[in-house]
Amino acid sequence: MSEERIPKRSEVPEQFKWALEDIYATDEKWAEDLQKLKAMPERIAAFKGRLSESADTLYDFMQLSDEISVLCDSLGNYAQRRSDEDTANAKYQGFLGQLMNAYVAVNSAGSFETPEIISIEEDKLQKFYEDKPELKLYKRALDKLRRKKAHILSEAEEKILALTGEMGQSPENIYSMFSDADLRFPDAVDKDGKAHQVTHGSYIPLVQSEDRVLRKSAFESMYGTFDKFRNTCAATLSAQIKAVNFYAKARKYESSLEAALDGTEVPVSVYKNLIEAVHDNMHYMYDYVALRKKLLGVDELHFYDLYTPVVPDADMKITFEEAKETVLKALAPMGEDYLAILKEGFENRWIDVYENEGKTSGAYSAGARVHPYVLLNHKDTLNCMFTLAHEMGHAIHSYLSNKNQPVVYSDYVIFVAEVASTCNEALLMQYLLKNTEDKKQRAYLINYFLEQFRTTLYRQTMFAEFELKINEMVAAGESLTAEGLNELYGELNKLYFGDGIVLDDEIKLEWARIPHFYYDYYVYQYATGYSAAIALSQRILKYGEPAVKDYIGFLKGGCSTDPISLLKGAGVDMATTQPINEALAMFGELVKEMEEAMS
């Protein structure tokens, strides 16, 4: 593919485009199914007030829910994928708008589902299972819904809570508008006096630069700007945390953490174990910080020195064909069945490979009933090869869950999602290290791996600890001020990175830059997922077929049980600190290997 000019969609060869005709042969077929969805509210309404009348009625309603899920899956995938391949195409924006209107009507028509199912008496529900054994298929789904009974309020109270919904979103919306739309950063200046635009998107590439003057300038531009608005940022974050605690209290949870984790069936202890395990392994990060300082040859290491590669000029050129071949070889330990699905995806146009005008940026995998779809914007880099392995990990997880679970349990939760993708990355990395003899390239690979550990395991855990602490402060009646938040965030950076790095005043403001603090206990899942993936990749390489069998069983599991049980079946117990300790021990070994490779 030419790099001089980004091609139009029509200029991209067919074999590099995803096969959306596998969902609908034509746009007209999509429109026919949309009409079916538009007719669903009437079919749903026929069940209102009747879910407790008989086993047959409840079963028929659950079957209708499955039918709607399958229909929405096809309609949503086709419209969203078509829109993403060329965002300038107004036709598919229109499709998405029509679909959203139909979704809203369906959801509104089915608003009676939760209250009616929750109100069925336990004895009666057990009798339903006896009267109609087919209903047992939905037992887990019904139990999950009914588990919330203790946290569902009276009808009048629920109405009031529902009215606060938009208000509860306000802190995130205000922060998003402020940070993404209103904030402007002064240009960063490099060692030659050349100006570089600083945006949220350009910031990381700028602090990855070999030019230290530019790195420092970008760092000061970013955090100097946030410093001017520190009280505004503290007020929006405080409002967000107060809202989260209000909803937890209103729904009779012990804490905001318990409320957030309850929906995904993850015990609170898993969150706290993560923080404890990382605390116990801080020495590895201190070793890495010391090594980074030594390799960069600086008198003092600053936070703007953390992102620049210590082996800057060893990147490899890897074409898409080479990337596919290497990924196939690297994932050979997964066994023939896994590789067959991977080849099917490569050969049957599951992947939209290259950039074109108007195409959505980045990369993702989308599970669909026919087969998954993967969006890439492939450049011939090492990073893009890892992205291919990562997204195909998600894709095969979706494929196996869809093929092996009934519709109601075919989706998987975020807590396990990153495991399947990151396990592939870990296997690819270990394959490359085993098969790379060039000293400089090995060091480049190890540096890449170490940075994943730093940014995913240590950094996200630090975020998770900060989030927990500010929630505890609000729950205890303390106020969140800019000064207090800066102090807490500075202390955590000192704890996580040690004395080998200068605690720049600017880094104390980083909390103001992180949108994830508005996502309600979300970030910890990156760290737990990464730990589980590292542990499972090691297990697969060590034990072979039995470990692979366990792992494939996990990929087939969808959400047929809770995420901790699913991962336990794969061979990793996230209810303990062991997987995190093992992953961090591997990080420690890699730091040593990096030191040897660069000596």
Task: Put a short name on every predicted segment.
Residues 252, 379-399, 421, 426, ...:
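Active-site recognition of the HExxH zinc-binding catalytic motif
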Residues 412-441, 449-451, 455, 529:
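Post-HExxH zinc-binding segment in Zn-dependent metallohydrolases
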Residues 329-340, 366, 394, 398-406, ...:
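Conserved helix-loop functional segments at active or binding sites
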Residues 316-318, 370-389:
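Short pre-active-site segment immediately N-terminal to the catalytic Zn-binding motif
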Residues 10-14, 25, 117-120, 140-147, ...:
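C-terminal, non-catalytic "cap/extension" segments appended to globular domains
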Residues 316-318, 351-370:
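Catalytic zinc-binding patch centered on the HExxH motif and its immediate surroundings
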Residues 1-313:
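A well-structured
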Residues 295-333, 339, 373-374, 397, ...:
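Long, K/E/R/D-enriched contiguous segments that form extended
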